[in-house]
Amino acid sequence: MLKAMKIVIVNGPNLNLLGRREPSIYGTKSMEQVLVDIQRAYPDVHFEYRQSNHEGDLIDWVQSYGLVSLENACLQAVDGRSATPVDRPSGCSRVVKGIVLNAGGYTHTSVALRDAVACTEVPVVEVHISDITKREAFRQVSLLTDVCAHSIVGHGTDGYQEAVEWIINHNK
């Protein structure tokens, strides 16, 4: 089952600076090292990683990876009639089973990203390296938590691996 499993990790703004930005809060481990550790721990899982400082990119990725109907099926119009589902191409062996999402600052501000997460057909696990409930007042509100399948906060970069483990267990 794991060999066909694909998990997408999506990071938001400033997470490209992980390991260098505010190490007293976010630690010294780079995202590259986090990804190496995750792949080492789960060699049979296919991981895809995306990071952007732009809100629209995050929304596009959550939609494209999170909508099973878009990922797993093709739609084909026949003679101008309504679209009909057809089988996936035989080369499409990996199906997205979950999304690990650290939306960074957009966690607290983006209704549009929240709406995209709410539309997903795969579980989205929200991850925050620091404990946002113990940070500044403006960081204590997550617009995403109630539309995510699970939330992991304050576990440092280990939270990413915990999120992967949650998705794997959820798909057993």
Mark where each language-model region is.
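Intrinsically disordered, low-complexity domain-flanking/linker segments in eukaryotic proteins
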Residues: 67-95
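Short beta-strand elements at the ligand-binding edges of bilobed clamshell
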Residues: 139-157
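Mobile beta-alpha loop/short-helix "lid" or hinge segments that flank ligand
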Residues: 8-11, 129-143
